[in-house]
């Protein structure tokens, strides 16, 4: 197969590993800088040009689209889809998962376990919003944040009110979530490929911190997940319409709660921690499922 990898940086661990795994399995791998691709949206013959030449003959495309280039990245990926190229994750599903609120709304509709979450616009509603998520301590998240940036733990109602007012004053869209104390600053990253959890790791926040993201100094370790956690992760990825996803789960007193479904999960943490060839499994999934003009939208909403 001839496989395109949409990535701004060919030197990133995840991009390198996907290219290596593809070459090892006998495929032609081409890394394309997402922002340097441009499109000809012509009737009957949609095209993508790159460095002055049209991109042709691709069987599949692996999107590694960073959060900051979601809009343009999804447009390029959608153009590949219009050309009949099979996407590992499709543009609609990526756009869906990048909107944290939309993701939670879709997951809640399907009855998937979530932390109680509030969303509001008007400052008059702050006291009721705080009560809605069972009061302080609570977590406030900026909707556009990634890698744990823009996430605040408020220990008291007073602190929560001040932080919410500050974010609202900056015209930031925010979510307010119950704090799951029993998770103890740890979450579980389940790596879903197709309809299986192929690898999972526990991420523990460093002392004095509650955000377990590896970018925030969290430490990864091996973990055995429960059947319920496995089913929750697979269902969450399916609701979002993602073939490959990093599903972040908290262990709570009332079962697994989904924090986030990531459409472009990093490979370094999971491969180094588990010793598994995750990149190889992703390429294998493409081989089994990829094919021309198989770009029907998965998921709803």
UniProtKB/Swiss-Prot annotation:
<dbReference type="GO" id="GO:0005524">
    <property type="term" value="F:ATP binding"/>
</dbReference>
<dbReference type="Pfam" id="PF08443">
    <property type="entry name" value="RimK"/>
</dbReference>
<feature type="binding site">
    <location>
        <position position="262"/>
    </location>
    <ligand>
        <name>Mn(2+) 2</name>
    </ligand>
</feature>
<feature type="binding site">
    <location>
        <position position="260"/>
    </location>
    <ligand>
        <name>Mn(2+) 2</name>
    </ligand>
</feature>
<protein>
    <recommendedName>
        <fullName>Probable alpha-L-glutamate ligase</fullName>
        <ecNumber>6.3.2.-</ecNumber>
    </recommendedName>
</protein>
<dbReference type="InterPro" id="IPR013651">
    <property type="entry name" value="ATP-grasp_RimK-type"/>
</dbReference>
<keyword id="KW-0547">Nucleotide-binding</keyword>
<feature type="binding site">
    <location>
        <begin position="211"/>
        <end position="213"/>
    </location>
    <ligand>
        <name>ATP</name>
    </ligand>
</feature>
<keyword id="KW-0067">ATP-binding</keyword>
<feature type="binding site">
    <location>
        <position position="260"/>
    </location>
    <ligand>
        <name>Mg(2+) 1</name>
    </ligand>
</feature>
<comment type="similarity">
    <text>Belongs to the RimK family.</text>
</comment>
<feature type="binding site">
    <location>
        <position position="260"/>
    </location>
    <ligand>
        <name>Mn(2+) 1</name>
    </ligand>
</feature>
<dbReference type="Pfam" id="PF18030">
    <property type="entry name" value="Rimk_N"/>
</dbReference>
<dbReference type="GO" id="GO:0009432">
    <property type="term" value="P:SOS response"/>
</dbReference>
<feature type="binding site">
    <location>
        <position position="187"/>
    </location>
    <ligand>
        <name>ATP</name>
    </ligand>
</feature>
<dbReference type="InterPro" id="IPR041107">
    <property type="entry name" value="Rimk_N"/>
</dbReference>
<feature type="binding site">
    <location>
        <begin position="178"/>
        <end position="179"/>
    </location>
    <ligand>
        <name>ATP</name>
    </ligand>
</feature>
<feature type="binding site">
    <location>
        <position position="260"/>
    </location>
    <ligand>
        <name>Mg(2+) 2</name>
    </ligand>
</feature>
<dbReference type="GO" id="GO:0018169">
    <property type="term" value="F:ribosomal S6-glutamic acid ligase activity"/>
</dbReference>
<dbReference type="GO" id="GO:0005737">
    <property type="term" value="C:cytoplasm"/>
</dbReference>
<dbReference type="InterPro" id="IPR023533">
    <property type="entry name" value="RimK"/>
</dbReference>
<dbReference type="GO" id="GO:0036211">
    <property type="term" value="P:protein modification process"/>
</dbReference>
<feature type="binding site">
    <location>
        <position position="248"/>
    </location>
    <ligand>
        <name>Mn(2+) 1</name>
    </ligand>
</feature>
<dbReference type="InterPro" id="IPR013815">
    <property type="entry name" value="ATP_grasp_subdomain_1"/>
</dbReference>
<keyword id="KW-0479">Metal-binding</keyword>
<dbReference type="GO" id="GO:0006412">
    <property type="term" value="P:translation"/>
</dbReference>
<feature type="binding site">
    <location>
        <position position="262"/>
    </location>
    <ligand>
        <name>Mg(2+) 2</name>
    </ligand>
</feature>
<keyword id="KW-0648">Protein biosynthesis</keyword>
<keyword id="KW-0436">Ligase</keyword>
<feature type="domain" description="ATP-grasp">
    <location>
        <begin position="104"/>
        <end position="287"/>
    </location>
</feature>
<dbReference type="InterPro" id="IPR011761">
    <property type="entry name" value="ATP-grasp"/>
</dbReference>
<keyword id="KW-0460">Magnesium</keyword>
<dbReference type="GO" id="GO:0046872">
    <property type="term" value="F:metal ion binding"/>
</dbReference>
<dbReference type="InterPro" id="IPR004666">
    <property type="entry name" value="Rp_bS6_RimK/Lys_biosynth_LsyX"/>
</dbReference>
<keyword id="KW-0464">Manganese</keyword>
<feature type="binding site">
    <location>
        <position position="248"/>
    </location>
    <ligand>
        <name>Mg(2+) 1</name>
    </ligand>
</feature>
<feature type="binding site">
    <location>
        <position position="141"/>
    </location>
    <ligand>
        <name>ATP</name>
    </ligand>
</feature>
């Amino acid at each position: 197969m001839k496989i395109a990898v949409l990535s701004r940086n060919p030197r990133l661990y995840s991009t390198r590993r996907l290219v290596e795994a593809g070459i090892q399995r006998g495929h032609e791998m081409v890394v394309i800088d997402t922002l340097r691709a441009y499109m000809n949206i012509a009737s009957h013959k949609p095209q993508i040009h790159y460095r002055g030449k049209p991109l042709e003959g691709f069987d599949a495309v692996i999107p590694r689209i960073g959060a900051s280039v979601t809009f343009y990245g999804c447009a390029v990926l959608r153009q590949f889809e219009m050309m009949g190229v099979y996407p590992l994750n499709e543009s609609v599903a990526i756009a869906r998962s990048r909107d944290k609120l939309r993701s939670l709304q879709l997951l809640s509709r399907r009855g998937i376990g979530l932390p109680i979450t509030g969303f509001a616009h008007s400052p008059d509603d702050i006291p009721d919003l705080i009560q809605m998520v069972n009061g302080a301590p609570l977590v406030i998240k900026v909707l556009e944040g990634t890698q744990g940036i823009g996430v605040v733990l408020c220990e008291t109602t007073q602190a929560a009110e001040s932080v919410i007012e500050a974010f609202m004053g900056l015209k930031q869209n925010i979510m307010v979530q119950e704090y799951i104390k029993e998770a103890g600053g740890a979450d579980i990253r389940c790596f879903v490929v197709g309809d299986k959890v192929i690898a999972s790791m526990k991420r523990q926040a460093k002392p004095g911190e509650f955000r377990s993201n590896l970018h925030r100094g969290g430490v990864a370790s091996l973990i055995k997940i429960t059947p319920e956690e496995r089913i929750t992760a697979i269902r969450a990825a399916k609701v979002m319409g993602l073939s490959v996803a990093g599903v972040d789960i908290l262990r709570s007193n009332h079962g697994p709660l989904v924090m986030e479904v990531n459409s472009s999960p990093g490979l370094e943490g999971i491969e180094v921690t588990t010793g598994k060839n995750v990149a190889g499994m992703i390429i294998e999934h493409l081989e089994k499922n990829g094919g021309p003009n198989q770009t029907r939208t998965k998921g709803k909403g």
